[in-house]
Amino acid sequence: TRKECPLDIMGYDIDKKTIGLARENAVQAKLGNTIHFQQQPLSSLSSRKMYGKIICNPPYGERLSDKKEVEKLYKEMGKVFGKLDSWSHYILTSHSDFEKLFGKKASKKRKLYNGNIKVDYYQYYGPRPKHTHKFFHEELTKSR
């Protein structure tokens, strides 16, 4: 038998309406009780957990009026995510200067499309959790 790893999924956004829509989508996907949603600013993001993953699709700043705000957000993301340096970060954006604004070159960058918008998927790999290897070794040993 396969032992399930605990899964802790959280969704954050500063906008209350966006959180409501995300919650509705989770319920429709039958994941309503699996994901914890919370309205909060990016600057409040923190965790006591040693390892984790952040996956985000921030605003792209496609409209000229939003560009400066988005660039400010990307700089803040770099500072906030930098405090979680043992975590992996995955960011989807169309902004060509994202790495410069974020303050770090991605471990890997993939070109994708989000609808008809050409985007880049920036992957920043954190260290692998040491206990993961032990968990899988124990599972392999049990199954033999």
Q: Which residue stretches match the model-derived regions?
A:
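Class I S-adenosyl-L-methionine-dependent methyltransferase catalytic core
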Residues: 1-144
